[in-house]
Amino acid sequence: MREALSPGDAERLARDAEPEFDTIVAAGGDGTVAAVANGIAAAPRPLAILPLGTANVLAAEIGVPRGAAGRATMIAEGPARQAWPGEIGGRLFLTSAGVGFDADVVAAVDPRLKRRGGRFAFVWAALGELWRFRPTSMTVIADGIGHRVGELIVTTGRLYAGGFAVAPQARLDEPVLHLALFEDRGRVGVLGRWAALLFGRSARAAGATFAVARKVEIAGPVGAPVQADGDIVAALPVTIEIAPRPIPLVRPNKM
């Protein structure tokens, strides 16, 4: 067992793990899991998840058992199947990335409140960003096809954020990105699409378009934040694409 005590530790510890360890277990949230995935990217070996974070989207995506015994069995005996990450500036993400209101909320989260209050920190940040909301516009080019949007969510699988299904047909073992593109419809539009997400009706959100792509180029307000797996990882302009190779992800036997 190795403990990550500061930013960058999880990636470094995974990268430097002794070769006799045939499986790397990431204990933490989606950001920690992504950091570990980046650490093993150059020489992939099976990655298992022990979900201890705020949202644990990837754990929900693959159906990690809730009980300790089930999790131990999965880590020890579960098959490692390929999962295709996304990539931003050479860094991998495993669940989702976002630009627009979504990323503004992540950027506004108070780390101290996140440690104490978990998901409440995101709710509080969302309320603040909604109050301060200013319409924005971005150009998104997905595999050569242009879109004009106010917000973009990119996922590798079905789920996003707190387990909301934005791409019900998506599979982690398919080398494509799933895009939810939302027109800029102001504060009311933000409320509408997030209400649709909460009630599992993202496909019916006003001004929503859905697509798949391997490469997405995004231009908009220079310096606007870009989030991936719940952490700010870049700023506009940015390119998001499918990673050049999959990682072996340990899953429950039922998967």
How should each PLM-predicted stretch be described?
Residues 141-147, 171, 181-255:
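ATP/nucleoside-binding phosphotransfer catalytic cores, i.e., glycine-rich phosphate-binding loops
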Residues 111-121, 162-189:
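Gly/Ser/Thr-rich active-site loops/lids in small-molecule metabolic enzymes
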Residues 4, 41-46, 50-151:
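Catalytic core of DAGKc-family lipid kinases
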Residues 10, 31-36, 57, 83:
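Short glycine/serine/threonine-rich phosphate/pyrophosphate-binding segments
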Residues 98, 102, 153-166, 232:
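Glycine-rich phosphate/pyrophosphate-binding beta-alpha loops
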Residues 1-24, 34, 69-70, 240, ...:
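ATP/NTP phosphate-donor binding region
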Residues 26-30:
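N-terminal glycine-rich "phosphate-gripper" loop used for MgATP/nucleotide binding
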